[in-house]
């Protein structure tokens, strides 16, 4: 199950390590195929849950790693990646809030930082050769550490299945809690959890209740709606129900409030970067509430041209994030440009949560361009409706000229 030794002078490798079956097998495989190089395991804590980190260091060392670095990125992830992305209005193919995609650049950056710290000359990831993540990670590595060799075992070794990996570890007396039966492939962070594989590979199959792990089934959610208040400053949620919170804490509180109401579930078939389509079920409870609140305030404060521009930026940004182009000049420019609009996104929103829905039902902002006096359908003293006639004649002038020329 090994390959011909492909060592090209690699002495120390930093592996993006999760403790799962794949990365547990990668550690001994690297030693065998890269001249017994030193393996440094690296795990990014992006809010996937404490249970995922318990015993991780011991497991990495038992598999053959010399060190294991667990880096807490939760606050930075929300503050510097999730919030800026949401400020652009990015949403991939009209539905996906990019939970997995946003996590990849910060993980890759931290992995490079660990590599620099320990003096490594190579980076390794456990992404398959069919997915988006291989491109995302290696694109970030190219931008941040083009001098470091990148090793992608799934594109090199001959193992094809979980059974192969389990047999490989058993041959080397490396213990694992994994089993041959794994129904779904899941990826979690503070923002969301994704589910792929199993019955989901057939788009004619409705996801079973066992797919979802974070949110309640909307059918089983409370019959009584719950209202949650969000206060926003410069496009960032700063308070939830009147309580001042850090970015990460605000997201966690919204997750806890929205998940029991079944908020944030989507089932989509998306276009992968590598060309194929894939089906995924995503749960993003707190992020869905945040997105609804930010859009509600934008409705009040952005004029027509600004909102149109933001929508264009959001569409472009969604593809950049999804395609792993975070560390590019265009991404940097779009993020910076969006900040100027975010300066006016201030106010308070009340979101109603009910059986899978998150609807902004109240909103106010000190920067609001909405004027009840101008918008009213009743009698008013500030807007003379006769003024609209001249505007309409000028607005439709091109159409009028075109029609006259056609006669």
UniProtKB/Swiss-Prot annotation:
InterPro entries, A to Z: Arginosuc_syn_C, Arginosuc_syn_N, Arginosuc_synth, Arginosuc_synth_CS, Arginosuc_synth_type_1_subfam, AS_cat/multimer_dom_body, Rossmann-like_a/b/a_fold
Pathway: Amino-acid biosynthesis; L-arginine biosynthesis; L-arginine from L-ornithine and carbamoyl phosphate: step 2/3
Major localization listed first in the record, in broad terms: cytoplasm
SUPFAM superfamilies: Adenine nucleotide alpha hydrolases-like, Argininosuccinate synthetase, C-terminal domain
One of the GO biological process terms: urea cycle
Keyword rRNA processing among record annotations: no
Pfam families in the record: Arginosuc_syn_C (PF20979), Arginosuc_synth (PF00764)
Cellular component aspect of the GO annotation: cytoplasm
Positions with a binding annotation for L-aspartate: 128, 132-133
Keyword set, alphabetical order: Amino-acid biosynthesis, Arginine biosynthesis, ATP-binding, Cytoplasm, Ligase, Nucleotide-binding
Highest taxon in the source lineage: Bacteria
Assembly and oligomerization: Homotetramer.
HAMAP family on file: Arg_succ_synth_type1
Protein name: Argininosuccinate synthase
Annotated source species: Shewanella oneidensis (strain ATCC 700550 / JCM 31522 / CIP 106686 / LMG 19005 / NCIMB 14063 / MR-1)
């Amino acid at each position: 199950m090994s390959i011909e030794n492909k060592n090209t002078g690699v002495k120390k490798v930093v592996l993006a390590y999760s403790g799962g079956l794949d990365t547990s097998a990668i550690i001994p495989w690297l030693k065998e195929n890269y001249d017994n190089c030193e393996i440094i395991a690296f795990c990014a804590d992006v809010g996937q849950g404490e249970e995922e980190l318990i015993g991780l260091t011991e497991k990495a060392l038992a598999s053959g790693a010399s060190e294991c670095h667990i880096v807490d990125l939760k606050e930075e992830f929300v503050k510097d990646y999730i919030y800026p992305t949401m400020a652009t209005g990015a949403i991939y193919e009209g539905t996906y809030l990019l939970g997995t995609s946003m996590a990849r650049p910060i993980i890759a950056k931290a992995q490079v930082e660990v590599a620099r710290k320990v003096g490594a000359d190579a980076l390794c990831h456990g992404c398959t050769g069919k997915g988006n993540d291989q491109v995302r990670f290696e694109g970030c590595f190219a931008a941040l550490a083009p001098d470091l060799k990148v090793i992608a075992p799934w594109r090199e070794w001959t193992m094809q299945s979980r059974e192969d990996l389990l047999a490989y570890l058993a041959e080397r007396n490396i213990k694992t809690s994994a089993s041959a039966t794994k129904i779904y492939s899941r990826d979690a962070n503070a923002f969301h959890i994704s589910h792929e594989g199993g019955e989901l590979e057939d788009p004619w199959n409705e996801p079973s209740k066992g797919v979802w792990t974070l949110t309640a089934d909307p059918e089983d959610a409370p019959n009584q709606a719950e209202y949650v208040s969000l206060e926003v400053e410069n496009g960032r949620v700063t308070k939830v129900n009147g309580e001042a919170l850090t970015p990460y804490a605000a997201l966690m509180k919204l997750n806890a409030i929205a998940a029991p109401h079944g908020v944030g579930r989507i089932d989509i078939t998306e276009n992968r970067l590598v060309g194929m389509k894939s089906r995924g079920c995503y749960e993003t409870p707190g992020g869905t509430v945040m997105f609804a609140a930010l859009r509600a305030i934008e409705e009040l404060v952005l004029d027509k041209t600004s909102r149109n521009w933001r929508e264009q930026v959001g569409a472009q940004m969604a593809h950049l994030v999804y395609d792993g182009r975070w560390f590019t000049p265009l991404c940097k420019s779009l993020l910076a440009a969006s900040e100027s609009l975010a300066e006016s996104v201030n106010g308070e929103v009340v979101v109603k949560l009910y059986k899978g829905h998150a609807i902004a039902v109240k909103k106010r902002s000190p920067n609001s361009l909405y004027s009840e006096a101008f918008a009213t359908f009743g009698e008013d003293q500030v807007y003379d409706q006769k003024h609209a006639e001249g505007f309409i004649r000028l607005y439709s002038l091109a159409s009028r000229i075109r029609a006259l020329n056609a006669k």
